[in-house]
UniProtKB/Swiss-Prot annotation:
Allows the phage to evade the CRISPR/Cas system type I-E. Prevents the DNA-binding activity of the CRISPR-Cas complex. This is Anti-CRISPR protein 31. It comes from Pseudomonas phage D3112. GO terms for biological process: symbiont-mediated suppression of host adaptive immune response; symbiont-mediated suppression of host CRISPR-cas system. It comes from the Viruses. Keywords: CRISPR-cas system evasion by virus, Host-virus interaction, Inhibition of host adaptive immune response by virus, Viral immunoevasion.
Length: 52
């Protein structure tokens, strides 16, 4: 059984971001850090819909 992460957890962890949101490694860690958690959560909602 795999661990399920919240959008906020993914938005705060570059490794998780790369695994779930950016598998093609298009965003650098600097770009990731420059975005707020809220911005990264909004990107996930846009891509995958609201959290259940």
């Amino acid at each position: 059984m795999s661990t399920q992460y919240t959008y906020e957890q993914i938005a705060e962890d570059f490794r998780l971001w790369g695994e779930y949101m950016d598998p093609n490694a298009e965003m650098t860690e600097e770009e990731f850090q420059a975005l707020s958690t809220e911005e990264k959560v909004a990107m996930q909602v846009e891509a995958f819909g609201a959290e259940a």
